[in-house]
């Protein structure tokens, strides 16, 4: 099946014009989307809980209200709080104040797909899912570009929800990169699988396993870090630009032969079965139940794992290596103040 890609020239922003947009939450995506929409000429207000971010958003020049107050004023409400908090914010503040015929948007379908949020039938429900972190989304926009987004419709009582979703995606800058249609279920399943099996879970385990293999064999941790982690960005950039073909073309013949010969020794049938098991847990709701139970228990296991990883040799070596290259930190100029503060504290 061929998926149509929409660009700026294909999308009319009129369905979103003259509508007040309330972005609920000012984390990475909320920050990027609200700022990009405002620059694109849309009427944006923020809905937040009192706290540091409330004051930070005011300094950024937005009108700031509670989530309930922002929802009551808005025609479009975009849920940008963390997945694990959305159901509570929805139940207490958004649902009681959402007008019939309003557009309710999400950047990830978790709460809709797993039944944690169930909007009334008279509410338009859409997804606009940027395919990248918020700071990159903001950076690309400021530099004149954008990142691709997916859009989809869950409920459409007014008949124009898809057009509103595409206009929103254009407003955050995705029209110059490409906008693709999806469904809530497809976006949620593929996003969770990609994160867990490949982009984050699979990749971090692969990198650390390679690092440990070299160190255990007596090689320098710093050089092992360069070989298994630091160079990863350059290899991924080649794949990003031209797929595996460009990566193989730009690497040596020695590298290419070794990659094709020995790659299957690393990603074995057992690894592939593990991926299928991860996918099944996402599809049948097992992972969602585990994650919500973990959150409701106070994140004890997650905090334990975070502590273990931070104290490990790989992370400690990475800090030493990155300290030798201070220019690396200059690349991250578009995180929210809260993100930067949290990351600095973690370091």
From Swiss-Prot:
<feature type="binding site">
    <location>
        <position position="252"/>
    </location>
    <ligand>
        <name>substrate</name>
    </ligand>
</feature>
<comment type="similarity">
    <text>Belongs to the ketol-acid reductoisomerase family.</text>
</comment>
<dbReference type="Pfam" id="PF07991">
    <property type="entry name" value="KARI_N"/>
</dbReference>
<protein>
    <recommendedName>
        <fullName>Ketol-acid reductoisomerase (NADP(+))</fullName>
        <ecNumber>1.1.1.86</ecNumber>
    </recommendedName>
</protein>
<feature type="binding site">
    <location>
        <position position="231"/>
    </location>
    <ligand>
        <name>Mg(2+) 2</name>
    </ligand>
</feature>
<dbReference type="InterPro" id="IPR014359">
    <property type="entry name" value="KARI_prok"/>
</dbReference>
<keyword id="KW-0460">Magnesium</keyword>
<dbReference type="Pfam" id="PF01450">
    <property type="entry name" value="KARI_C"/>
</dbReference>
<dbReference type="GO" id="GO:0000287">
    <property type="term" value="F:magnesium ion binding"/>
</dbReference>
<feature type="binding site">
    <location>
        <position position="49"/>
    </location>
    <ligand>
        <name>NADP(+)</name>
    </ligand>
</feature>
<feature type="binding site">
    <location>
        <position position="227"/>
    </location>
    <ligand>
        <name>Mg(2+) 2</name>
    </ligand>
</feature>
<comment type="pathway">
    <text>Amino-acid biosynthesis; L-valine biosynthesis; L-valine from pyruvate: step 2/4.</text>
</comment>
<feature type="binding site">
    <location>
        <position position="191"/>
    </location>
    <ligand>
        <name>Mg(2+) 2</name>
    </ligand>
</feature>
<dbReference type="InterPro" id="IPR000506">
    <property type="entry name" value="KARI_C"/>
</dbReference>
<feature type="binding site">
    <location>
        <position position="195"/>
    </location>
    <ligand>
        <name>Mg(2+) 1</name>
    </ligand>
</feature>
<feature type="active site">
    <location>
        <position position="108"/>
    </location>
</feature>
<dbReference type="InterPro" id="IPR013116">
    <property type="entry name" value="KARI_N"/>
</dbReference>
<comment type="pathway">
    <text>Amino-acid biosynthesis; L-isoleucine biosynthesis; L-isoleucine from 2-oxobutanoate: step 2/4.</text>
</comment>
<feature type="binding site">
    <location>
        <begin position="83"/>
        <end position="86"/>
    </location>
    <ligand>
        <name>NADP(+)</name>
    </ligand>
</feature>
<feature type="binding site">
    <location>
        <position position="134"/>
    </location>
    <ligand>
        <name>NADP(+)</name>
    </ligand>
</feature>
<dbReference type="InterPro" id="IPR013023">
    <property type="entry name" value="KARI"/>
</dbReference>
<dbReference type="GO" id="GO:0005829">
    <property type="term" value="C:cytosol"/>
</dbReference>
<feature type="binding site">
    <location>
        <begin position="26"/>
        <end position="29"/>
    </location>
    <ligand>
        <name>NADP(+)</name>
    </ligand>
</feature>
<dbReference type="GO" id="GO:0009097">
    <property type="term" value="P:isoleucine biosynthetic process"/>
</dbReference>
<dbReference type="InterPro" id="IPR036291">
    <property type="entry name" value="NAD(P)-bd_dom_sf"/>
</dbReference>
<feature type="domain" description="KARI N-terminal Rossmann">
    <location>
        <begin position="3"/>
        <end position="182"/>
    </location>
</feature>
<keyword id="KW-0028">Amino-acid biosynthesis</keyword>
<dbReference type="GO" id="GO:0004455">
    <property type="term" value="F:ketol-acid reductoisomerase activity"/>
</dbReference>
<feature type="binding site">
    <location>
        <position position="191"/>
    </location>
    <ligand>
        <name>Mg(2+) 1</name>
    </ligand>
</feature>
<feature type="domain" description="KARI C-terminal knotted">
    <location>
        <begin position="183"/>
        <end position="328"/>
    </location>
</feature>
<dbReference type="GO" id="GO:0050661">
    <property type="term" value="F:NADP binding"/>
</dbReference>
<keyword id="KW-0100">Branched-chain amino acid biosynthesis</keyword>
<dbReference type="InterPro" id="IPR008927">
    <property type="entry name" value="6-PGluconate_DH-like_C_sf"/>
</dbReference>
<dbReference type="GO" id="GO:0009099">
    <property type="term" value="P:L-valine biosynthetic process"/>
</dbReference>
<comment type="function">
    <text>Involved in the biosynthesis of branched-chain amino acids (BCAA). Catalyzes an alkyl-migration followed by a ketol-acid reduction of (S)-2-acetolactate (S2AL) to yield (R)-2,3-dihydroxy-isovalerate. In the isomerase reaction, S2AL is rearranged via a Mg-dependent methyl migration to produce 3-hydroxy-3-methyl-2-ketobutyrate (HMKB). In the reductase reaction, this 2-ketoacid undergoes a metal-dependent reduction by NADPH to yield (R)-2,3-dihydroxy-isovalerate.</text>
</comment>
<keyword id="KW-0521">NADP</keyword>
<keyword id="KW-0479">Metal-binding</keyword>
<feature type="binding site">
    <location>
        <position position="53"/>
    </location>
    <ligand>
        <name>NADP(+)</name>
    </ligand>
</feature>
<keyword id="KW-0560">Oxidoreductase</keyword>
């Amino acid at each position: 099946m061929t998926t149509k890609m929409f660009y700026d020239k294909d999308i009319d922003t009129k369905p979103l014009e003259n509508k007040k947009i309330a972005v609920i939450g000012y984390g990475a995506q909320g920050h990027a989307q609200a700022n990009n929409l405002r620059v694109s000429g849309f009427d944006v207000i923020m809905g937040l809980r009192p706290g540091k971010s409330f004051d930070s958003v005011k300094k950024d020049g937005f009108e700031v209200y509670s989530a309930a107050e922002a929802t009551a004023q808005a025609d479009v409400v975009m849920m940008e709080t963390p997945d694990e908090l959305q159901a509570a914010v929805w139940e207490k503040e958004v649902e009681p104040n959402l007008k019939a015929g309003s557009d309710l948007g999400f950047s990830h379908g978790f709460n809709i797909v797993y039944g944690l949020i169930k909007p009334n039938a008279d509410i338009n429900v859409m997804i606009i899912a940027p395919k990248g972190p918020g700071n990159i989304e903001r950076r690309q926009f400021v530099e004149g570009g954008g990142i691709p987004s997916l859009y989809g419709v869950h409920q459409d009582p007014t008949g124009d929800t898809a057009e509103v979703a595409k206009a929103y995606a254009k407003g955050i800058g995705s029209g110059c990169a490409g906008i693709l249609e999806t469904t809530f279920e497809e976006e949620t399943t593929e996003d969770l699988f990609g994160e867990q099996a490949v982009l984050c879970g699979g990749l971090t385990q692969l990198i650390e396993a390679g690092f440990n293999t070299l160190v255990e064999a007596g090689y320098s941790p710093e050089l092992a870090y360069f070989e298994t982690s630091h160079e990863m960005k350059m290899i991924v950039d080649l794949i990003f630009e031209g797929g595996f073909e460009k990566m193989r073309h730009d690497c040596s013949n020695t590298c290419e032969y070794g990659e094709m010969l020995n790659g299957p020794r690393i990603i074995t049938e057992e690894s592939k079965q593990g991926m299928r098991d991860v996918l099944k847990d996402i599809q049948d709701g097992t992972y969602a139940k585990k994650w919500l139970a973990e959150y409701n228990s106070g994140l004890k296991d997650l905090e334990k794992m975070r502590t273990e990883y931070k104290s490990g040799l790989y992370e400690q070596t990475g800090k030493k290596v990155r300290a030798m290259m201070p220019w690396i930190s200059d690349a991250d100029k578009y995180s929210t103040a809260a993100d930067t503060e949290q990351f600095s504290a973690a370091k």
